[in-house]
Amino acid sequence: MKVCFSNWFWRRPVAFALVGVVALVILSLIPLRATVARSALDADVVTGVARVIDGDTLDVAGERVRLEGIDAPEMAQSCGRNFFGTWKCGVVAANRLAELVRGHAVTCESRGYDKYGRMLGICFVDGHDINAEMVREGLAWAFVRYSQTYVREEAQARAARAGIWQGEAAPAWEYRAHRWASAEQGAPNGCAIKGNITAHGRIYHMPWSAWYASVKIEPEKGERWFCSEAQAIAAGWRPVISQ
């Protein structure tokens, strides 16, 4: 007796094989997707030796990091003492930050990026939050315009009259606004950022830079004025480094 099977029967192994192939492809993609997710997460953390730019900015493993949630005195800024006189709070803040990171690996966790392309980071040395330490020692304000993270540390510093809280001190953001308003009056078209060329390369100076007053712009040498920090960076200039 001749037994006949339908064509559907013979197609079933092929169908099952195709299903198996698809399943294997899907399974193979799962670890790939997990790897991509981990890589994206790893990109939000940088670790390495740090170089201090100023009291609230570091270079870590080639990444420019603005310490998130704090605002340190500018390099040219002075603050009032307990009873009389002033002290160079901007220089002291930068030097203290250098002490905190010197000889250590620094790990910074990203909280995003600012308009200049700098990572906004919370940075740690041996597990200790150095952003918090700068505020706690009275060497930076809690930058409450953008973050409430370090309000408690600022209250502690204020109560102890530590650092900037021992006398009168204009918050760094007010100091910058005042210096910019003053500098733009004498700058071409109100563009107050000085683009200087030195043996160390093309460097720009903000009106609150410690060397701003002494820098003379010579256009015939290729030096120039900038209207914004973003413009200076886009043109290939870098900020002056404190250390």
Describe these PLM feature segments.
Residues 1-13:
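N-terminal Lys/Arg-rich, disordered targeting/topogenic segments
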Residues 3, 97-117, 160-184:
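A broadly tuned preference for mixed-charge, low-complexity surface segments
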Residues 7-8, 29, 40, 199:
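Compositionally biased regions
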Residues 15-30:
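Hydrophobic membrane-insertion alpha-helices, especially the h-region
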Residues 26-39, 176-181:
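Short, basic/low-complexity N-terminal boundary segments at the transition from targeting/disordered tails
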Residues 33-143, 151:
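Electropositive
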Residues 140-148, 156-243:
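Mature, structured domains enriched in cysteine- and short glycine motifs
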